[in-house]
C-alpha cells in the first residue's frame, strides 16, 4: 500500500510516470481520449463520424499509440469501464462499497448535441466508494469523542486539545473504516498531520 502506484504502472507499461498518472486518473474519472491528449499536451485530429454525421475530435497518432500501449498492459481498465457502463445502462445506477445506489443523469442535449453520462460510471463508483470510507471514518471519530471541524474530500479535520492522544484516536478511527468495515484487499494508507490551521500556517 505504500508503493507509488503511478510509478509502478509506468514501469509496468513502459511509459513515463507523468503520462501514466494522467491516464490513471483520467480514465478513473471518465475522461475520453480527446481530453486525455489535451491533458498530456499531445495533438488531436479531426475525423468524420458516420454515426454522428459530422467531424469529431479524436486522439492524434501519438496519443493513440500511448493509450494503446497502456491498455495492452492493463486491459482490465477498459473492462472495468465497460462493466460500469453496462451496469448503468441496465440499472441506471452504480453501487458503492457500502451498497449505496448512485443514479446517473439520462442523456441530455447540451449545446445542440446529445450527451450521455455513462462514461462517468467508473468515476461515480470510485468517488462514491471513497466517500463511503470517509463517512464511516467521520462516524467513528464522532463516536470516539473527537471534535470534528470539517472534511475536504477524503480528509477529516479536527480541533485537538491533546494532540498526541487525538492523533492516535483519529488514525485508529480511519483504520477501522478502511480495514474493518470494508475489508479492502489492498489496504489504504492513513496519514495524520498537525498544524495551527488547516493551511498549516
Q: What residue ranges belong to the model's regions?
A:
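Conserved catalytic core of nucleotide polymerization and phosphodiester-bond processing enzymes
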Residues: 1-201
Amino acid at each position: 500500500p505504500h508503493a507509488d502506484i503511478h510509478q509502478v504502472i509506468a514501469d509496468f507499461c513502459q511509459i513515463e510516470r507523468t503520462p501514466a498518472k494522467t491516464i490513471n486518473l483520467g480514465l478513473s474519472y471518465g475522461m475520453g481520449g480527446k481530453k486525455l491528449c489535451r491533458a498530456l499536451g499531445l495533438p488531436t485530429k479531426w475525423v468524420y463520424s458516420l454515426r454522428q454525421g459530422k467531424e469529431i475530435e479524436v486522439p492524434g497518432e501519438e496519443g493513440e499509440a500511448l493509450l494503446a500501449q497502456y491498455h495492452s498492459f492493463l486491459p482490465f481498465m477498459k473492462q472495468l469501464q465497460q462493466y460500469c457502463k453496462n451496469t448503468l445502462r441496465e440499472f441506471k445506477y452504480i453501487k458503492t462499497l457500502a451498497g449505496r445506489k448512485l443514479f446517473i443523469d439520462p442523456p441530455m442535449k447540451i449545446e445542440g448535441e446529445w450527451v450521455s453520462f455513462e462514461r462517468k460510471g467508473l468515476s461515480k463508483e470510485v468517488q462514491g466508494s471513497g466517500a463511503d470510507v470517509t463517512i464511516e471514518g467521520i462516524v467513528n471519530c464522532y463516536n470516539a469523542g473527537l471534535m470534528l471541524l470539517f472534511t475536504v474530500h477524503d480528509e477529516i479535520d479536527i480541533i485537538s486539545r491533546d494532540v498526541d492522544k487525538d492523533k492516535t484516536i483519529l488514525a485508529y478511527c480511519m483504520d477501522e473504516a478502511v480495514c474493518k468495515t470494508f475489508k479492502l484487499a489492498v489496504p489504504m494508507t492513513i496519514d495524520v498531520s498537525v498544524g495551527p490551521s488547516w493551511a498549516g500556517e
